[in-house]
Amino acid sequence: MRTIVLFSTLMILVLSCMSNATVKSYSEEKTHSFDLTANPPIDLNIVDELPRDEHLGVSHADNVIGFCQECAHHCLQRKRVLGECRWFTCHCSRITIGVGL
């Protein structure tokens, strides 16, 4: 009987500490703001950062996500990083990908 009481008391203490820790971590996550007005985007000079539009040829994509996947594949074939993909316009960055490991 004594071990049951001791075990249940210990279990209650552990569970209460765990619940306090999870509430604290949840409240910290809520304080992070993803609002663009609070965190303005980085001001990049896009003319210098991105070259001209990349022409992918015939695109078989039905939506923007599929088009951007084709854009990323196109940039990787040219050993470049995907710069920007918006409104069915593909830009590969000027940054090249290293060939060897």
UniProtKB/Swiss-Prot annotation:
Q: Which GO biological process annotations does it have? A: defense response to fungus; killing of cells of another organism
What's one GO-annotated cellular component?
A: extracellular region
**Cystine pairs:** C68-C85, C71-C90, C75-C92
Tell whether Transferase is among the UniProt keywords.
no
Residues in the signal sequence: 1-21
Spell out where the chain crosses the membrane.
Answer: none
Q: Where in the cell is it found?
A: Secreted
Key words, A-Z? Antimicrobial, Disulfide bond, Fungicide, Plant defense, Secreted, Signal
Family of this protein: Belongs to the DEFL family.
How is this protein named in the record?
A: Defensin-like protein 222
